[in-house]
Curated annotation (Swiss-Prot):
Belongs to the ATP25 family. It is found in: Mitochondrion inner membrane. It is a peripheral membrane protein. It comes from Eremothecium gossypii (strain ATCC 10895 / CBS 109.51 / FGSC 9923 / NRRL Y-1056) (Yeast). The lineage of its organism: Eukaryota, Fungi, Dikarya, Ascomycota, Saccharomycotina. The keyword Lipoprotein does not apply. Coiled coil: none annotated. Keywords: Membrane, Mitochondrion, Mitochondrion inner membrane, Transit peptide. This is ATPase synthesis protein 25, mitochondrial. The gene is ATP25. Its main location: mitochondrion.
Length: 586
């Protein structure tokens, strides 16, 4: 129904045109003409022109973003060329998500090694809710644009955030609610799953401004040249917040006015002398050498006699009080490691002296030794957490200490504990020093930790097979495997390792044969000795062309084997007799 005013107007127009009551068709045509916008006359032209769509359906072109504008956030990329994916992700974060202060680092150029190499992008979000929304949108962009399934760490989803807010608001303690939620969603880490040809990934950190300043992730991923730019500056305490004594004095204004109008023609400070300048310079040098007390403490401990009774906990507390938590060098870590070892050796010798003297009270000495041992293990975690670089010497020294602990108590349960500690210790080097797993010293000490005079680990044979399959067995490692298998009386594994798993070069080595025979004679039985001769295992010397006469140790061990087995080497098989006596087959 049309309104009365409009309908009366249309009726008057129709009467003027026709002079009679209008029909329905004529009324509809007049109403269409009256209320149309005047563009239906040229229907062909209007359908082809872009203005035929209403203004609210016409698409407006997206304006180009002026990156030179000071109001547009800058993106800081590494000096080296970066993949297009990094550029696209950073631009999307800036243009679509509103992330500011975007910085990208290439971890291959970082001053410290990283667990996962690639490109790390840092960006600031305005709030925790902005960070949650940006995380969701960025993961959706990566999924639709590149077809990957990114992963995120940190924070909670928006739905979970709302649930927790409602749950905490029902408790009525809004202060604790806001504090709890703020710590869970102010930092997001997104693994984009985008990799280049070298296997380098892209990792995005979305942080609030306060969280970013607190973590200072730039100091971890920057290069050595940029390290000074991102180093945290320790602000000196200011006295501006302290109250002024004159604030409560009603005559303070008159006093300041009098001081402004007065002139002083004298100085209350003493004149500078040569002694004063010398003392000032000495004070400045002492400030620069602020680590001197730390090294003096370690030197004083090293100069103490071996029989001195020490309290390890007190010494370590003194060390922590003088420890510098910034600008740490390898010299600082060497001092800490030396102090830990000195304390351990002191307590170890004290325990040994007490055991030799048949002392009844050994509990406090064992507690001190256990404390020093655990402190040495915690050293590796502490150094890695404070961006220190672990080295081979520290690992070898720690393995020697673990061998000493094994000698004190070498039961099966203790071997299992040492093996578990060894796994945790090697995990620190898994990503930073993987070549150490091929090192001869590390491998030999690892083998020693698997067996004792009282027990052996079930994993010993598997570890020996692992060394065989990976090709880590050189002469020294093969000799140590033979000695340990013989000590554990694993005769079947020993024969398999010697005659089937050992390479031809090692089987032709006279020193390997000499240690093999000596280990058999030291830990074997007459039945085993006879079986080596009867089953023809000794004939491998002839097959491999080993010169028995050239190695006196091998020759004497072979003669002793025949003698202890009840055989006469001179009356043995002619082939073997000539080989033993002359060093060659006739």
């Amino acid at each position: 129904m049309l309104r009365a005013g409009r309908y009366s107007k249309a009726s008057s127009v129709l009467r003027a045109v026709g002079g009679k009551r209008p029909s329905v068709c004529m009324a509809s045509r007049v109403l269409t003409r009256l209320y149309s916008n005047g563009k239906e006359d040229d229907q062909v032209a209007s359908s082809s022109s872009p203005s035929s769509k209403p203004w609210y359906l016409q698409g407006t072109g997206k304006p180009e973003i002026d990156v030179t504008s000071p109001f547009v956030g800058k993106i800081k990329l590494p000096a080296t060329p970066v993949p297009d994916t990094v550029v696209n992700v950073t631009e999307y974060m800036r243009d679509k998500l509103g992330v500011t202060d975007i910085t990208c680092f290439n971890t291959h150029e970082a001053h410290r090694p990283c667990v996962k190499n690639g490109y790390v992008i840092l960006g600031c979000v305005k709030s925790t809710r902005h960070g949650a929304r940006s995380m969701i949108e960025l993961m959706r962009f990566l999924k639709t644009e590149y077809g990957v399934l990114p992963q995120k760490e940190g924070g909670i989803s928006v739905q979970e955030l709302r649930k927790r807010q409602k749950r905490l608001q029902r408790k009525g303690n809004l202060t604790s609610a806001s504090a709890e939620l703020a710590g869970e969603s102010d930092w997001y880490l997104i693994d984009s799953k985008l990799y280049d040809g070298n296997g380098s990934g892209v990792f995005v950190h979305l942080l609030t401004k306060e969280k970013r300043e607190d973590l200072n992730l730039e100091g971890l991923y920057c290069t050595s040249e940029e390290r000074g730019l991102y180093q945290k500056k320790v602000l000196s305490p200011s006295n501006d917040h302290l109250p002024n004594d004159d604030d409560d004095n009603v005559l303070a204004g008159l006093k300041r006015l009098a001081l402004q109008n007065s002139r002083r023609y004298y100085s209350s400070t003493s004149s500078a002398t040569a002694d004063y300048a010398r003392s000032s310079l000495q004070g400045g040098s002492n400030m620069e050498n602020s680590d001197a007390p730390l090294f003096s403490l370690v030197d004083s401990l090293a100069q103490l006699p071996e029989t001195e009774e020490l309290d390890p906990q007190e010494w370590i507390r003194s060390l922590d009080a003088k420890w510098a938590f910034i600008d740490l060098t390898e010299k600082h870590w060497q001092a800490r490691w030396l102090m830990y070892r000195l304390l351990y050796v002191n307590r170890l010798h004290a325990l040994q002296r007490a055991q030799d003297g048949d002392s009844a009270n050994l509990d406090h000495l064992k507690r001190d030794l256990t404390f020093c041992y655990k402190t040495l293990l915690e050293y590796f975690t502490l150094k890695q957490a404070m961006n220190g670089r672990l080295n081979k010497e520290e690992l070898v020294g720690m393995l020697d200490i673990m061998l000493t602990q094994k000698e004190l108590n070498g039961g099966y349960s203790k071997l299992v504990k040492h093996n578990r500690v060894l796994q945790q210790l090697l995990d620190h080097y898994k990503f930073h020093e993987p070549e150490l797993f091929r090192d001869e010293q590390i491998t030999i000490r690892t083998l020693k930790l698997m067996v004792s005079s009282q027990a052996k680990l079930n994993v010993l044979s598997e570890f020996v097979r692992f060394l065989r399959d990976t090709g880590y067995t050189n002469r020294n490692v093969a000799i140590k495997c033979i000695e340990i298998l013989a000590e554990a009386k694993e005769w079947r594994e020993l024969k398999t390792f010697m005659f089937r798993d050992t390479t031809a070069a090692l089987l032709s080595d006279p020193m390997v044969w000499a240690h093999f025979l000596r280990s058999i004679l030291a830990h074997g039985e007459p039945l085993l000795w006879r079986s080596l001769i009867d089953d023809g295992s000794i004939l491998w010397l002839v097959r491999c062309g080993v010169d028995v006469r050239a190695c006196e140790e091998l020759h004497s061990a072979l003669l002793e084997l025949f003698q202890r087995a009840g055989y006469d080497a001179v009356k043995a098989d002619s082939l073997l007799r000539d080989y033993i006596q002359d060093g060659a087959c006739s």
